[in-house]
């Protein structure tokens, strides 16, 4: 199979293949242009993987360009976060990082060119009046009374805007196109507005800032972008993209292509809604493991490779659709099942005492770090007469489907002995506090000599050697598949999206590394938390369960 045949195909790659075959382009140059006004989420990961992935596959280039045209909402903190997220996902940008603000002088010159051609004018309508004059989908707009100013007057007023001679909101520069256009984006869109705010890159040099639609296409052209890839909501904006480039003196005219954005069940992607979750303290911050942000997914324990695999599986189309959360969870579950070392931790502990085991003694039990990967080695886990097991792994009475410990019956302790429940001790409220058992000393990691069958296996932790751990059971943040469609999306927050448990773990986890994934046997996949874990306190986040419990609940 050739390299081209091995690449995933989609309509964008087909366009690129045709452009290269026809000689329209000899190389491929893409860009990822986020605005540094927030943290990236998994929807951005689709654009990152698409733009950087195409550049990699075609031996081309991909720029990281910050669309930094609104100093009021932007911050250097977001710049650094975005750079980190792109690199964590496994990509590197070509050359130096680009900023739209790098081109402010050229953008101003192109605006002056449009004025000189009679294609832009300074408007003094208020924002509300501009909105009113713009019309609607069913009614044409009407011309501003300032639309027919002379070129000389517009040049003077635009220079006055630049010099700070107008207050914010008192003037703007608009393109002179067609107020009766069926496309509202073409009804004399604003090109420049006034903002007296310090910019994180240019300081106080400017008090006028270009709008996205004016900046985006020119930045693409100046950087030699061959294929400008945007999500579908910018489809109508392509007309303005082309209009600007057609009416200025610039040698390169990139083409814009649109693809569907990523919509994911049980979450929201709107920056406004995500910000509300943070500011109203429904979550602990932008990196809360329940958030769809890349930093949140990373803290929860998602690997970069699992996110890339997810993006690869959903593909690139022009058709808007919503992806099941189970698809994302399946990718990380497959990754960690293959690569995560195993360990034992008891999340809801109850004491179990083996009465015929030598009291005060212990031994080491050898356990594989991965059941199907001997190259991952093994570890020694201490075993003693007193152990912790999970409360759900014992019942005084149970039917035949229950394959765990039952009063008077046997079960195997993982990689250790067969035990039999003999009696229990309860508190005054009837809760079991201790389970008393006997063990078969001849069954260490082997079947009973008399051939009796013991079907159930449960995990355990030696009480004398156990590490106290806080276990944070993260789940889906919302309880409905489409919270964004609800009248009040906050009312659909899942009250059990975070449950905090105090449990015990085997001593090998004492030196767990932040972010490293483990399978807690029979429980799920977990990683050491980067925020709350300390040298003296182990805090583990659940990344994902061993199976999709939501699918079962919905049946």
UniProtKB/Swiss-Prot annotation:
It is found in: Cytoplasm. Belongs to the class-I aminoacyl-tRNA synthetase family. Monomer. HAMAP family: Gln_tRNA_synth. ATP binds at residues 35-37, 41-47, 231, 261-262, 269-271. The gene is glnS. This is Glutamine--tRNA ligase. It comes from Enterobacter sp. (strain 638). A motif ('KMSKS' region) lies at residues 268-272. InterPro entries: aa-tRNA-synth_I_CS, Gln-tRNA-synth, Gln/Glu-tRNA_Ligase, Gln_tRNA_ligase_bac, Glu/Gln-tRNA-synth, Glu/Gln-tRNA-synth_Ib_cat-dom, Glu/Gln-tRNA-synth_Ib_codon-bd, Glu_tRNA_lig_a-bdl. Keywords: Aminoacyl-tRNA synthetase, ATP-binding, Cytoplasm, Ligase, Nucleotide-binding, Protein biosynthesis. It catalyses: tRNA(Gln) + L-glutamine + ATP = L-glutaminyl-tRNA(Gln) + AMP + diphosphate. The lineage of its organism: Bacteria, Pseudomonadati, Pseudomonadota, Gammaproteobacteria, Enterobacterales. One of its GO terms (biological process) is glutaminyl-tRNA aminoacylation. It holds the Pfam family tRNA-synt_1c. Residues 317-324 are annotated as: Interaction with tRNA. A motif ('HIGH' region) lies at residues 34-44. L-glutamine binds at residues 67, 212. GO terms for molecular function: ATP binding; glutamine-tRNA ligase activity.
């Amino acid at each position: 199979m050739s390299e081209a045949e091995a690449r995933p195909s989609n309509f964008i790659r087909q366009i690129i293949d045709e452009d290269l075959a026809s000689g329209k382009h000899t190389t491929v140059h893409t860009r990822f242009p986020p605005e540094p006004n927030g943290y990236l989420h998994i929807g951005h990961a689709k654009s990152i993987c698409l733009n950087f992935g195409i550049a990699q596959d075609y031996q081309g280039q991909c720029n990281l360009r910050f669309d930094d045209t609104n100093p009021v909402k932007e911050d250097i903190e977001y710049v650094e976060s975005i750079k980190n997220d792109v690199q964590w996902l496994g990509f590197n940008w070509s050359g130096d990082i680009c900023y739209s603000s790098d081109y402010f002088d050229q953008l101003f010159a192109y605006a002056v060119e449009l004025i000189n051609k009679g294609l832009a004018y300074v408007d003094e309508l208020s924002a509300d009046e501009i909105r009113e004059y713009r019309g609607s989908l069913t009614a044409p707009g009407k011309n501003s009374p300032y639309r027919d100013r002379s070129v000389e007057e517009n040049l003077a007023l635009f220079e006055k805007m630049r010099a700070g001679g107008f207050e914010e909101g008192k003037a703007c520069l608009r393109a002179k196109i067609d107020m009766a256009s069926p496309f509202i984006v073409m009804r004399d869109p604003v090109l420049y507005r006034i903002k007296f705010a310090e910019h994180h890159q240019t300081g106080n040099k400017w008090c006028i800032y270009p709008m996205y639609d004016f900046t985006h296409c020119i930045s693409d052209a100046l950087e030699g972008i061959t294929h400008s890839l945007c999500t579908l909501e910018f489809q109508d904006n392509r007309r303005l993209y082309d209009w600007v480039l057609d009416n200025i003196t610039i040698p390169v005219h990139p083409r814009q292509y649109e693809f569907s954005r990523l919509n994911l069940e049980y979450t929201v992607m709107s920056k406004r809604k995500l910000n509300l979750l943070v500011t109203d303290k429904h979550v602990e911050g932008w990196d809360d493991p329940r958030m769809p942000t890349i930093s949140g997914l990373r803290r929860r324990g998602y690997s970069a490779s699992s996110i890339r695999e997810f993006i690869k599986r959903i593909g690139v189309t022009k058709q808007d659709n919503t992806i099941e959360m189970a698809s994302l969870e399946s990718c990380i579950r497959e990754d960690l099942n293959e690569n995560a070392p195993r360990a034992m931790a008891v999340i809801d502990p109850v004491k179990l005492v083996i009465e015929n085991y030598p009291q005060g003694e212990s031994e080491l039990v050898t356990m594989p770090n991965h059941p199907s990967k001997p190259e991952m080695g093994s570890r020694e886990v201490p075993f003693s007469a007193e152990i912790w097991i999970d409360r759900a792994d014992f019942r005084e009475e149970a039917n035949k489907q229950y394959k765990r410990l039952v009063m008077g019956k046997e079960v195997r302790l993982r990689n250790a002995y067969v035990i039999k429940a003999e009696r229990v001790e309860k508190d005054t409220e009837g809760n079991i506090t201790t389970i008393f058992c006997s063990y078969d000393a001849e069954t260490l990691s082997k079947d009973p000599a008399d051939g009796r069958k013991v079907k159930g296996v449960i995990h355990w932790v030696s009480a004398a050697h156990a590490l106290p751990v806080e276990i944070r059971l993260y789940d889906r943040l919302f309880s409905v598949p489409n919270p964004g469609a609800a009248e009040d999306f906050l009312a659909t927050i899942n009250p059990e999206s975070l449950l905090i448990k105090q449990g015990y773990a085997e001593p090998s986890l004492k030196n767990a590394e932040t972010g490293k994934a483990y399978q807690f046997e029979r429980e799920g996949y977990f990683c050491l938390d980067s925020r709350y874990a300390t040298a003296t306190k182990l805090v583990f986040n659940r990344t994902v369960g061993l199976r999709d419990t939501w699918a079962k609940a919905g049946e």
